[in-house]
Design a protein with these regions (language model features):
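Hydrophobic face of amphipathic alpha-helices that form TPR/SEL1-like repeat modules
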Residues: 2, 7-8, 29-83
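Low-complexity, intrinsically disordered regulatory regions enriched for serine/threonine
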Residues: 2-32, 183-208
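Conserved C-terminal structural/oligomerization subdomain of aldehyde/semialdehyde dehydrogenase
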Residues: 83-88, 308, 345, 399, ...
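Glycine-rich loop-to-alpha-helix module at the N-terminal edge of alpha/beta enzyme cores
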Residues: 85-176, 182-186
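Short, well-ordered beta-strand elements within core beta-sheets of diverse protein domains
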Residues: 86-93, 110-114, 230-231, 344-347, ...
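Rossmann-like NAD(P) dinucleotide-binding subdomain of oxidoreductase/dehydrogenase enzymes
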Residues: 177-354, 480
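A short hydrophobic/small-residue beta-strand
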Residues: 255-257, 436, 520
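ALDH superfamily catalytic-core signature
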Residues: 318-460
Length: 565
């Protein structure tokens, strides 16, 4: 999953400058939008949509229950990927803004963790869930204009995220039971057949069962909220991942700082607005926005601050390594969900027609910009041609367009950077012998960051598309002959988040389940995550811990309790 925590690409930034000249707008060579004059704290652009709840549209940072700008008063632009036009701006926070946000979260934690029992936290989460559902269409509309995804996909993301909040609300009620008091452990044996050694003498000095000293001691474990949790959220599924990270931490009694991607800050701010209405105390959920250019500095400052006790990051493996390096300096608790270059394996006995439909749905969801989207489609040579034809027929049904246009099933890429990378990957494959079966592999003419669904055949393992996370509506088809061969090739990747297998042979399914090195496996279907999963495992550089993160936000304390008898 790509993320904007660090990037070599320039961002689009709105800079406020004081001048007596007219309020003209200029664009520099670095793609920086400069607004001359002193605009209001939240500069207003003509919105391309209308919300039922206009108060839900927030454009400032959310700190301790207040809507504030950055200290520099600079702002960055939020673009609609479907048009390439600016429709909002947000504060471009810097390192100077970090301490005040963390101070707010820490002071709120001191009260929230001690005075809000589990049942009250569950009630707050349920209230938040109801408000999210009530604002379902407004939130989805914001998502469409942030990410570019079609409206039906945005609505599905809202529903999924709301379901996570409701699930964690249920889990919250089970978090504060009285700690169990274990039975006294047997003492070391004091009798020895031979003469006592120095170790025997030390053991004989320990209390034995039945003595007063032994009966007065009990072991206990007290689980407490770990503290301030930082959520670094990508632009691919900004609402769902903000809710997944935040709801788990809030259920545990922690406070949360959300640092959304520079492409998708408005949805996180809308969720903070609803959290206020739900009754969460000030400072429990803070949102700090910043531009792409300032993201590395701000993220590092947040990760390295001593009052931040846990960090949850979703994004690329490259950036995840940098986040991990920043966190390990202070030994913070860390949760990483990283990239995937997912294989999709079609054996000759699979239901080819249904498999082609499933592949099209999985691959072109959000224009291929999902960490679990299939990138490498391995097809048994005996059914390669027939399956290719079925897949092309399914892909040809997709309707490319703006996410708010009725009937759209494939939206634009979220960023121009992603579009340029997709073009480069496609060109590399074709230069090395790949053949286009569908699409152009290039940007569509007109406004927005559109690319038609593209299918390439004749793919080889030496092409960049086989090695890198694509995050675009491009799919490569690879031929294989044996099960051992396809397992070896599928596992030959540094990022193995997900994988898919389609066959009617149940023995083969179990073998693939055991042999494929992927954290999430879809057998004859999708491998979507759900909140009840306890943990993902280490799979290459893809996943460390999973959606069920409540235990990640709790700390354990060991104690020896002496009863005053």
């Amino acid at each position: 999953m790509n993320s904007a925590v660090t990037s070599p690409f320039a961002s689009t930034t709105v800079t406020t400058t004081s001048t007596s000249s007219s309020n003209s707008t200029t664009r520099s060579n670095t793609n920086s939008l400069v607004i001359h004059g002193l605009p209001p704290v939240s500069p207003s652009f003509q919105l391309p949509f209308k919300l039922t709840d206009v108060d839900l549209l927030r454009r400032d940072c959310h700190v301790h229950g207040e809507w504030v700008s950055s200290r520099s008063n600079k702002r960055f632009a939020v673009l609609d990927p479907g048009t390439g036009r600016v429709w909002a701006t947000c504060p471009d926070s810097t390192r100077d803004d970090v301490h005040s946000v963390i101070k707010s979260s820490f002071s709120a934690f001191q009260v929230f963790s001690r005075t809000t029992p589990a049942r009250e936290r569950a009630r707050l989460l349920i209230s938040w869930h109801h408000l999210i559902i009530a604002s379902r269409m407004d939130l989805a509309t914001i998502l469409v204009h942030e990410t570019g995804k079609p409206l039906n996909e945005a609505l599905a993301e809202v529903d999924y995220g709301a379901g996570l909040v409701r699930w964690f609300a249920g889990e919250a009620e089970h978090l504060d039971p009285d700690p169990p008091l274990p039975s006294p452990a047997p003492s070391p044996t004091t009798s020895r057949a031979s003469s006592p050694t120095s170790e025997d003498s030390a053991a004989s000095a320990l209390p034995t069962p039945g003595t007063g000293a032994f009966l007065r001691k009990r072991g206990a474990i007290l689980k407490r909220p770990i503290g301030v949790v930082l959520a670094l959220v990508p632009w691919s599924f900004p609402l769902a991942l903000t809710l997944r990270k935040s709801a788990a931490a809030l259920a545990a009694g922690c406070t949360v700082i959300v640092k959304p991607s520079s492409e998708t800050p408005i949805s996180a701010l809308a969720l903070a607005c609803l959290a206020d209405r739900a009754g969460f105390p000030a400072g429990v959920l803070n949102v700090l926005t910043t531009s792409l250019g300032n993201t590395p500095v701000v993220s590092e400052a947040l990760c390295m601050h001593p009052l931040v006790k846990a960090v949850s990051f979703t994004g690329s493996a490259r950036v995840g390594k940098r986040v991990a390096a920043s966190c390990t300096r202070n030994l913070k608790r860390l949760s990483l969900d990283l990239g995937g270059n997912c294989p999709f394996i079609v054996f000759d006995d699979a239901d080819l027609e249904q498999t082609a439909k499933d592949l099209a749905a999985l691959k072109w969801r959000h224009a291929g910009q999902a960490c679990v989207a299939p990138n490498r489609c391995y097809v048994d040579r005996r059914v390669y041609e027939s399956f290719s034809n079925l897949l092309i027929a399914e892909a040809a049904k997709l309707k490319l367009g703006h996410g708010m246009t009725r009937g759209t099933t494939l939206g634009p890429l979220t960023t121009i950077r992603g579009l340029y990378k997709a073009e480069a990957l496609c060109k590399d494959a074709m230069d090395k012998g790949a053949v286009k079966l569908l699409g152009t592999g290039r940007r569509e003419p007109g406004d927005g960051y559109f690319m038609a669904p593209t299918v390439l055949s004749g793919m080889t393992d030496g092409m960049l598309m086989c090695r890198e996370e694509i995050f675009a509506p491009i799919l490569g088809l690879y031929v294989f002959d044996t099960e051992d061969e396809v397992v070896s090739r599928a596992n030959d990747t540094p990022v193995g988040l997900a994988g898919y297998v389609f066959t009617k042979n149940h023995d083969r399914l179990w073998r693939m389940f055991e042999r494929l090195e992927a954290a999430v496996l879809g057998m004859l279907g999708d491998g979507y995550t759900n909140p009840s999963w306890k943990q993902w495992q280490w799979i290459h550089a893809s996943a460390i811990h999973g959606p069920r993160r409540i235990s990640d936000n709790k700390g354990s304390r060991d104690a020896t309790i002496v009863n005053d008898m």
